[in-house]
Amino acid sequence: MTKYVFVTGGVVSSLGKGIAAASLAAILESRGLKVTLLKLDPYINVDPGTMSPFQHGEVFVTEDGAETDLDLGHYERFISTKMRKANNFTTGQIYESVIRKERRGDYLGKTVQVIPHITNEIQAFIERGAASATCGEPDVAIVEIGGTVGDIESLPFLEAARQMSLRLGRNSACFVHLTLVPYVATAGELKTKPTQHSVQKLREIGILPHVLLCRADRRIPDDESKKISMFSNVPEDAVISVWDADSIYKIPQMLHDQGLDRIICEELKLSPKDADLSMWSALVEKLENPKQEVTIGMVGKYVDLTESYKSLIEALRHASIHTSTKVNIEYIDSEELETNGVDSLKHLDAVLVPGGFGRRGTEGKIAAVRYARESKVPYLGICLGMQLAVIEFARDVVGLKQANSTEFDPDTPERVVALITEWYDREGKVETRTEESDLGGTMRLGSQRCPIKPGTMAEEIYGKDVNERHRHRYEVNNRFVPQLEAGGLIISARTPSEDLPEMMELPRSMHPWFVGVQFHPEFTSTPRDGHPLFRSFVEAALANKQARGVQA
């Protein structure tokens, strides 16, 4: 039978519940347990797919095509279990499901209320999510409840967790509470009062945490831990200090050293083998001792909030581990390139243009593409970054001066990039879209496998085929492909059913390393294995740096 660990947060948001939950999962997996994770989001949106990156950060796409919270990306990077749509749900989905049932008459004329109907539905979603784990029936399901204790939006989820722990019985569920212990510089001390009040709030609704994870900018002294223990009624050895680390991959060892996994296993009456965190130690060792260094420019419009590119940043970090290279990322606002030109790119070893939406900043990104192509600087374009690379090539090499995407200019006569109106999903079902379709949940989403053209750089990187995740509405228009190919551009991968261009590149006679991909390879990169595309990109940046050094 699956046992549950509920992870809650207090005092403020953005303390790192997702990292804490994923780190605990990594330790338990290293002890031989089958583990899955779920994220419960209290907002009323059905999913984060239409939310601004400034509001929500990155939207992580699962293999089965769900648009989910960025924490699911952390989950997949820390454990081997793949996430699915059932691993993330929102208040919006819960209410949508309950209202559908009410309309069908499933409640037999009863008054539908938050308790028991909403809380029962939350419990059903949790158990369904755990049961659908790709690892088979999990030994432990770690359930991260979004928001902060005390928020009105989180109350139904906390109540559902309380009811569920009572229903499952002793040693079947436990609670881990992550809270802030701020350092007040003027007083020169850590303050435990916010943590005391946060635990008090939990106790008011009937939840007694078994473990406290105390976030601070430094390790919490023993006397402060004793005070927290006394006022929160949590054993002193279960008051665990979680201080700021320069790498998230150090957190599993930090938590294990303080006995978190031992406490959880004792509470849940589990007797697994000892933890083996040697893989994590080796990763950290490689990360901290690089043999070389490169600087990569990431040109986007969400650069003030790097959470928007969380998986991409981690994928570059994974490549740094597997190439023994320190990767410095410079975030470059594409709108500034429109105003000030591309001089700020000239010291870079490589240029990356990530995915994005909307017209704002696109001409700055196109300027970055042109600079990379003409200066023979390694270029990687992801999703929109590939589309803009094709547009730049069409304009400046092929001579289609009005080439554009219908996303930015619906009236352009040279629709090099246009809306996909029909495609097959990963199950082979035909999906159709029009300009009038809803925005939510109407993109091409999820994994799809497609063959790679022999003799290409794509084949050198991936092999005979590629299986990556997608999140896009627009696609390179096949009507213009013959002209693009005549100019030298190579379409190196296409979807098998609809013949949609998936990868493009320039031949080495034109450029040493210039690649665009319509999919999002960052979603499948892990610290354990890295990713072949990002590894190749970093190696190309190294080669460019060395070549420039020889010339200098």
Curated annotation (Swiss-Prot):
UniProt note on regulation of activity: Allosterically activated by GTP, when glutamine is the substrate; GTP has no effect on the reaction when ammonia is the substrate. The allosteric effector GTP functions by stabilizing the protein conformation that binds the tetrahedral intermediate(s) formed during glutamine hydrolysis. Inhibited by the product CTP, via allosteric rather than competitive inhibition.
Catalysed reaction, written as an equation: UTP + L-glutamine + ATP + H2O = CTP + L-glutamate + ADP + phosphate + 2 H(+); L-glutamine + H2O = L-glutamate + NH4(+); UTP + NH4(+) + ATP = CTP + ADP + phosphate + 2 H(+)
Binding sites annotated in the UniProt record for UTP: 13, 191-196, 227
An example Gene Ontology molecular-function term: identical protein binding
UniProt entry tagged with the keyword Nucleus: no
Residues the record lists as binding L-glutamine: 356, 384-387, 407, 473
Gene3D superfamilies for this protein: 3.40.50.880, P-loop containing nucleotide triphosphate hydrolases
InterPro entries, sorted: Class_I_gatase-like, CTP_synthase, CTP_synthase_N, GATASE, GATase1_CTP_Synthase, P-loop_NTPase
EC identifiers of the protein: 6.3.4.2
Location of the active site: 383, 520, 522
Domain Glutamine amidotransferase type-1: from-to ranges: 295-547
Similarity comment text for this entry: Belongs to the CTP synthase family.
Remarks, miscellaneous: CTPSs have evolved a hybrid strategy for distinguishing between UTP and CTP. The overlapping regions of the product feedback inhibitory and substrate sites recognize a common feature in both compounds, the triphosphate moiety. To differentiate isosteric substrate and product pyrimidine rings, an additional pocket far from the expected kinase/ligase catalytic site, specifically recognizes the cytosine and ribose portions of the product inhibitor.
Stated role: Catalyzes the ATP-dependent amination of UTP to CTP with either L-glutamine or ammonia as the source of nitrogen. Regulates intracellular CTP levels through interactions with the four ribonucleotide triphosphates.
The name this protein goes by in its record: CTP synthase
